[in-house]
């Protein structure tokens, strides 16, 4: 996609760098090849300069999702999530019904200078809880960008089957 924006510039540089390249009646020789390589190198340098110009001006979070892991143990489930850059004030964990909601949000307007630098990183996970999760004793911790949520398990008593009469 990036190259599409540069196609008109590529054509202009190649054609203007050596007019004989556009002349089909001229014999092809090594001078043309050298000129073409020089034109491509010049274009590559210009593209690099343009990329460097915007490199640190557009901060963004280059991740489509948070890496997570679900571990099942005898007495608990453990959810481990990699959340680099987030601290505990940026993350909210809630339980509603049989769902666990984990939300993270960072909004940063760079106030150190008069620029319009702005960053927003966020994630939103909804996890369906098993019936044997003790929702009253769920705990969490955050250390070095690793969020650990511990879901204690309780014994679920099987209910006796009830026969439904047919009318």
UniProtKB/Swiss-Prot annotation:
Domain of life per record: Bacteria
InterPro entries on file: A-crystallin/Hsp20_dom (IPR002068), HSP20-like_chaperone (IPR008978), HSP21-like (IPR044587)
Domain sHSP: 59-167
Keyword Endoplasmic reticulum: no
Keyword Cell membrane found: no
Gene Ontology BP, a term: response to heat
Gene3D superfamilies per UniProt: 2.60.40.790
Keywords, in A-Z order: Stress response
Database matches in Pfam families: HSP20
Similarity annotation: Belongs to the small heat shock protein (HSP20) family.
Protein name per UniProt: Small heat shock protein C1
Organism: Rickettsia bellii (strain RML369-C)
Lineage: Bacteria, Pseudomonadati, Pseudomonadota, Alphaproteobacteria, Rickettsiales
Gene designation: hspC1
């Amino acid at each position: 996609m990036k190259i599409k924006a540069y196609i008109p510039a590529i054509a202009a540089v190649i054609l203007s760098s050596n007019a004989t390249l556009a002349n089909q009646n001229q014999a092809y020789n090594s001078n043309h090849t050298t000129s073409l390589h020089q034109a491509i190198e010049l274009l590559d340098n210009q593209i690099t300069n343009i990329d460097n110009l915007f490199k640190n001006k557009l901060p963004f979070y280059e991740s489509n999702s948070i890496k997570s892991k679900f571990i099942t143990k005898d007495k608990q489930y453990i959810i481990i999530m990699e959340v680099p850059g987030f601290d505990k004030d940026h993350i909210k964990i809630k339980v509603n019904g049989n769902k666990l909601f984990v939300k993270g949000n960072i909004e940063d307007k760079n106030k150190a200078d008069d620029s319009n630098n702005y960053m927003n990183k966020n994630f939103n996970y909804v996890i369906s809880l098993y019936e044997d999760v003790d929702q009253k004793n769920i705990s969490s911790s955050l250390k070095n960008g690793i969020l650990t949520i511990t879901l204690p398990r309780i014994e679920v008593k099987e209910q006796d089957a009830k026969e439904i009469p047919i009318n």
